[in-house]
């Protein structure tokens, strides 16, 4: 990547280093002794799921969605006072402390960046970005404005997962060197469709937002947008982000790997999906180059099967110098020694106190001025692996990466995919470096 292009992706280390962060901005409502006031941006099924965790500890002021029916339905469910299709109305409201971003992926980072610049705290669903560049810009916006941004990787507040990672860190299987994560499930065929008239209750221009404009088409709108390059990140980004995050956490790695490889394709579905229905991804971190310091992560995805490893649709195997651990957010945890004999699991003597859910962790973080469990720097590191894997699959090539410079080496096409093309005519939400 050229130096000019590289500078578009980078900011000073002080702006992005966790050690340089001071979480000093607290919610206005907290200062006044009340509950934080929040606005929901994106009012589909995911927002309704998140609402359960926010309901008792925050006041919902806004329901924002370009689908009027969804916005009004969420208003009824949440008690929100106001409805809008335009995010800017929410950000202009000085009484709002934070927003919850549960939009399609292509809106995640643009909406969150605008919120940070408006002085709002942000809970952003996974993946936090549609592409690597926007993830970097979101981290920078959070640091620059000293606001709290929580990433929607809820396992960071899951007691079983937290305990499992602590056991790994305490050496239950020795030095953790390799892990394999998976997400296997049977999704539906989205069929073949053609552009058609936009439903009257939908502000489709706002829905497309900063992305390249594509005419309305039924199988790239609600939920099915996941499977289109322009709007989603495929199932590596959709569900895979959760397993990749746990795997990275347990493996004990931060930042970018030095190599990323992935193969995948459409092996099962004959439909309009652009992302693969099957993929196998591998990432490597060199550590200090010595034996015992190098790390490897594998991730497998199949969205057409019900044959699960360990009879579990999602999970991670960790391989260490003294044994192996299997853990799943479905409530499963097993450990074996290096002779494949089961190890009796005993929870760590001292474990961190966890909030009642991931949403409350966010609210407590903004009222206390502390970091949440899935602080945006953590979220971006995990989502970066998603983006690298998708680039590998789309180009059909492995990638060599410079972690310090945050660049892909010797591959102009892949380097361009660290960002994305935007609307030719421009849009008010397009993030700028």
Predicted regions and their residues:
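Beta-strand-loop-alpha-helix segment that lines the small-molecule cofactor/substrate pocket
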Residues: 104, 109-157, 171
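N-terminal secretory signal peptides and thylakoid transit peptides that target proteins
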Residues: 1-16
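N-terminal Rossmann-like NAD(P) cofactor-binding module of classical short-chain dehydrogenase/reductase
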Residues: 99-100
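N-terminal Rossmann-like dinucleotide-binding module
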Residues: 13-78, 155-158, 247
